Amino acid sequence: MKKFNVTVNGTAYDVEVNEVKAAAPAAAPKAAPAAAPAPKAAPAPAPAPAAAAAPVPAGAETVKAPMPGKILSVAVSAGQAVKKGETLLILEAMKMQNEIAAPHDAVVSEVRVSANQTVSTGDDMVVLG
């Protein structure tokens, strides 16, 4: 028997290994009879459908998530006037911070996301009126 000290991800382990001597190849083991298949688990209940987002007022425009990610910060609030190109919020996707900007001069009608919230592509984030 040989002893080794192995380090994995910074943790040291003492390992004992049996030494195998060269010998004639062992006969193939006999096949064991197949076990009966395990019963399948009941399917998980379907998740409840997400609540529909509130309708957008006539003449308003929504700024939608261009990609899935996490909202790092929201730079605007309802009632705030914004100019074209002004940062509305910061969306982190694939470890990159993406500034989501106002597409035109407008007033923020509603902010539908908050910091640390996860969004999917196409989710409404800000409503501009």
UniProtKB/Swiss-Prot annotation:
Activity regulation comment: Completely inhibited by avidin.
Coiled coil: none
Ranges of biased composition (kind: Low complexity): 24-39, 49-58
Reactions catalysed according to its record: (S)-methylmalonyl-CoA + Na(+)(in) + H(+)(out) = propanoyl-CoA + Na(+)(out) + CO2
Domain of life: Bacteria
Group of enzyme by EC: translocase
Keyword field: Biotin, Cell membrane, Ion transport, Membrane, Sodium, Sodium transport, Translocase, Transport
One GO cellular component, as annotated: plasma membrane
Name this polypeptide is given: Methylmalonyl-CoA decarboxylase subunit gamma
